[in-house]
From Swiss-Prot:
Domain N-acetyltransferase: 480-663
An annotated GO BP: tRNA acetylation
Organism in which the protein naturally occurs: Methanopyrus kandleri (strain AV19 / DSM 6324 / JCM 9639 / NBRC 100938)
Presence of the UniProt keyword Nucleus in the record: no
Binding positions (ATP): Q260, G286, R287, G288, K289, S290, A291, L292, L293, G294, I295, R438
SUPFAM superfamilies the record matches: Acyl-CoA N-acyltransferases (Nat), P-loop containing nucleoside triphosphate hydrolases
Keywords carried by this UniProt record: Acyltransferase, ATP-binding, Cytoplasm, Nucleotide-binding, RNA-binding, Transferase, tRNA processing, tRNA-binding
Family: Belongs to the RNA cytidine acetyltransferase family. TmcA subfamily.
Catalysed reactions, semicolon-separated: cytidine(34) in elongator tRNA(Met) + acetyl-CoA + ATP + H2O = N(4)-acetylcytidine(34) in elongator tRNA(Met) + ADP + phosphate + CoA + H(+)
CDD domains hit by this protein: NAT_SF (cd04301)
Gene Ontology CC, one term: cytoplasm
EC number of this enzyme: 2.3.1.193
Name of the molecule in the record: tRNA(Met) cytidine acetyltransferase TmcA
Enzyme class: transferase
Amino acid sequence: MPDKAEVFFDEGVLDFADVDEIVLDVGEEALAEALAHRHRRMIVFQGDEGKAEAAGVVTAGAADVLFDVRDRPISVLYVTDSLKEDTYARERYEEFRRVLEGFAEEANFEYELEALTFSGSKRALGTTWDLMVIDLSYDLDPDAIGRLVETVRGGGLVIFQTPPFDRWRNMWTAFHKSLVTPPYTLDHVGKRFNRRFIRKLKEHDGVWIVDTDEWTAEPEPSEDVDLEVEVKRRERPDLDPPDDAVLPEELYRMCATEDQFRALIRFEELLESNGKTALILTADRGRGKSALLGIAVAGAGVTTDVYDVVVTASEPENVAVLFEFLLEALRELGVEYDVERDDKGNIVYVETDDFVVEYERPSEASEIECDLMVVDEAASIHVPILERILDNNDKVVYSSTIHGYEGAGRGFSVRFLQNVRKRRDVRLIEFKMHEPIRYDSDDPIERWLFDTLLLDAEPADLDKEDLECVKEMRVEFEKPDLRYWFEDPEGEEELRQFIGIYVMAHYRNRPSDVMVLADAPHHEAYALKTETGKIVTALQVAREGTIPRDVITKMRRGYRPPGNVIPDLMVQHHDALDFPRMKGLRIVRIATHPDIMRHGLGSRALKELAKIAKKKDYDWIGTGFGANEELTRFWLRNGFVPVHISPNRNPVSGEYSVAVIRPISEEAEEIINRANFEFRIKLADWLGETHRDLEPEVARLLFEPMSSLRYRPTLTEGQLRRLKKYADMVHTYEIAADAVRELAKAYFLDTEDRPELSEEEELLLITKCLQRWKWADVADVLGEEVPDLMRSLRDLVGLLYEEYKEDLQRSAAVEGIRKAVERLADKGLTGTVIVEVEEGEPKEVIIRREERLEL
């Protein structure tokens, strides 16, 4: 391949398109810079006419040059909102393809063209392209842009087609239309994200903007640009493996950068270590972490005694690159293998004669013991799962993206690594990869991408004065002006502080979250700021409710109005048809600066939000969260009432989702308290079925009474006799378990005059009686011996029996009467029923004038 290139676009390409020569000038200059620095460059064609042909001209001219430079077919990816026939998007694609195909045939260069829609953009993950064209004429999908732009290699071009900027600033995209929720219309949707996106295109180096209606360019092409350039190429590391290397030399030669080479050495340290060891690999996107892991896993399986390897990530698609390089490494080593794929075509299982590699979802992986556990994109997995994985395995690799659309690696570092570093039983090996694989460092298009999508947003740096403000609670609760944040360059710093807190928090962040905040008509932001002006707590809330009656009628039949999570839940699970017409706020996200957690700032923010809600005549504030003990305690402490728990654990977080609501109005309070009581009744039953694995501490908190309600236990005469005999040490627990369970339910559902039990006693009732755990499992959780727990439970039952004795006898009496009447009715007898009761129990039932039946 030549070391020099003459970046001249053959003017013959203009025969296939009606565009101005300025398109050639811009294309040549952009490609020359890209090749000289092994960076990417971007060209934006904005206008109504000619942009598809202009994109075709630059792509064709660049592909002609690159075919000589690369000495292989040039890969081109075209992405748009739709490829359906008879759409404007398809029409633009065909115009683009006509230019590219026509000139390729004339100039005799080879290329490979693939077209995707934004909805299918995940297919581009792990791929690499020489040239990319993204049609933004109708839609602006931030998540897709985050995935796609990074896949273009150094020396290549990213080309955007957009509407005229003047119109685009005020235009609704397809994404915007998805933000419309009742009672709002499209007219209520903002365009702040569009305007910031345009501003960022103008601010950054390496970006040319061509107006295809006026045929002008900004910046203008330089007249003295040198189009004969030295082509900068990626140099593989000229390094020798360690003399005592465990992994084969062939695998070290596969490393594309020195960082990958060094990371492989650190992986060997993990393999040779004794005891519990964790290797932490962190990097920005596109640094080759996943590829390196695939190479490393192949080496571990072939050359060590590692047999079973488990790979986990939030989705199977996230480990596609890992499996791709695993197979490539096996081929390099001459190892035969078999592959299994899921129904979407993702590799999920690889087997060789020496070892197996299997993909598992995070919640399932956290319960597995294996020789080697690999966690890819750990940032998107909740910390409790990451910790359980380490608890169960001696050799674990955690790979995490620092800046990226899947999650926040720095949040992973802050929360997870802080905990791991405190553990004396874990050896920690850390390595950060800096060198990009596809392009060289300091790439201007990467800087544009990170800035535009706020992938590198960080919380404010807090100095001594800021910390003093927090300590003394000298903070103000503010509702920021989103227009100022997104449209005024001076608002950029506060926006970055706000989003940066979420990046550090437990939320999985995507670029589309920023667009929702910017433009969704029902979303708004609140911030807790120090007197010094630093944002320390960030809240994003969604206005819900005030749903029209005709929509509520549809909801009864299963219709789920978009953007109304809490009202929908209350109708579907509690048949609360008055609730959707009420006005509420759903907390979408709340997070506090990681340096000042547990200072009461989150609670202060919720208190201030409740004041605003009351002042503005809202009826309720609600939210949903992954239920662990700490978060559940936080929400309940702040006056939120649980009304629902999901039937299944989230496959990524491994937690059940709980919905809680804080009533503001009296009308809402009545509905919410009733829903809470019904929820607790259902939870008492679910704990023995769908939620047997719910953390007992969480269950205990969810049972906390939120209002004064009376629950009367119900037992038959037979159950009551067995319960007595169990309390009197005649029966074992198993004989009376059904009756004891009803007694435990009575304790957790009753809120009037119930006895005070300790936390340990309540956990015993939950685990043994409601969740029906084995005695050994209860003992493991409570840290007690089984015989001691047996005695404690019998004593508890005796105490509760005395407390609910009258209710239990009354229920047995009623049950006895019902059965007696049924027996008489079966005989066809009629008359007046007379019940004689002694000490709360029925002694006989009389049918006056006809027959007497002894009980």
